[in-house]
Design a protein with these regions (language model features):
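C-terminal alpha-helix
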Residues: 242-254
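Phosphate-binding loop that captures ATP/GTP phosphates
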Residues: 41-81, 208
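C-terminal boundary of histidine-terminating zinc-finger modules
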Residues: 221-239
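Walker A/P-loop phosphate-binding motif and the immediately C-terminal alpha-helix
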Residues: 2-40
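Cytosolic-facing regulatory segments adjacent to core modules
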Residues: 83-130
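Acidic-aromatic/histidine active-site loop/patch
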Residues: 1-3, 255-262
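Active-site signature of alpha/beta-hydrolase-fold catalytic machinery across serine-
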Residues: 21, 25, 47, 135
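Conserved catalytic-core segment of NTP-binding enzymes
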Residues: 28-34, 115-116, 120-209, 215
Length: 262
């Protein structure tokens, strides 16, 4: 399996939406895709038609000792969804303490699913530094850092790079990091200027295109689905497809170590 951790040092960059739509594109291309939510907001499921009143998820399953197979949902576009789940505050803290104490928890749990070498796991994480992001990076084959074309995102890049260097880069099976610029409005001069700076700074690590700002993204979420499913001919949908092709060209070139295949 290949594990893609979708991360960001700051909130409000559209990370969950990007993770959902990339998972959707990959699934429609014939890959088996697991969309795994490691964010307590439990929002990734909303893109895949998981019932709003469902409380099941990996947090509750882990605390109760249940197998993850029991909380896997068949989502739209053929994506298998592993929600975070709904837990009370005390249980959330217990869950966080557990995964902080068990750094191999995520990788071992994924291996229990007996995924094939070609299967893809897309992990959504909370913004910034957290036990969830650290856990995802400890299991990741590749990290995808989502940024905006603004000064705040530019300034936050070193923070996430330090986390990747600490928790992912030392592993021999980690294949590197990529960057994608989301919610781009090409009519703004500042956006164009920041894009130039990001391309100079990040070079080949940066997806050569962008994800354009598109009202269809919000509309698709309101319909409990992905943009790829809701409006496949939109500009952002084309961007997601191009980004997924670039992403998989990077990920598929990474050798899979024997220990990373269940």
């Amino acid at each position: 399996m290949k594990v893609i951790a979708v991360v960001s040092a700051k909130g409000g960059v559209g990370k969950t939406t990007l993770a959902a739509n990339l998972a959707s594109v990959l699934a429609t291309s014939g890959r088996r895709v697991i969309a795994l939510d490691l964010d307590p907001q439990n929002a990734l499921r909303l893109h895949f038609g998981v019932p709003l009143d469902s409380i099941d998820g990996l947090s509750r399953a882990t605390l109760s000792g249940d197998a993850w197979q029991s909380i896997m949902f068949d989502g739209v576009d053929g994506v298998t969804v592993l929600p975070y789940g709904a837990v009370v505050e005390d249980d959330r803290r217990r869950f966080e303490a557990y995964i902080d104490h068990e750094p191999q928890w995520l990788l071992q749990s994924l291996e229990s699913l007996r995924l094939d070498a070609s299967d893809i796991v897309v992990i959504d994480t909370p913004p910034g530094s957290s036990v969830y992001t650290r856990t995802a990076l400890c299991a990741a084959t590749f990290a995808l850092n989502v940024v905006l074309a603004d000064a705040a995102s530019y300034a936050a890049i070193p923070q996430m790079e330090r986390m990747i260097d600490a928790y992912a880069a030392p592993r021999p099976d980690f294949g590197g990091v990529g960057y994608v610029v989301n919610q781009v409005d090409q009519s703004r001069q500042l956006t164009k200027d920041v894009l130039k700076v990001l391309r100079h700074l990040l070079g080949e690590k940066l997806f050569p295109g962008v994800i354009h700002q598109d009202e269809g993204v919000s509309e698709s979420l309101a319909c409990d689905t992905t943009l790829i499913h809701y409006d496949p001919l939109s500009q952002a949908a084309a961007d997601f497809r191009a980004c997924s092709q670039w992403l998989m060209s990077r990920v598929d070139s990474i050798a899979v170590s024997p220990g990373s295949v269940a």
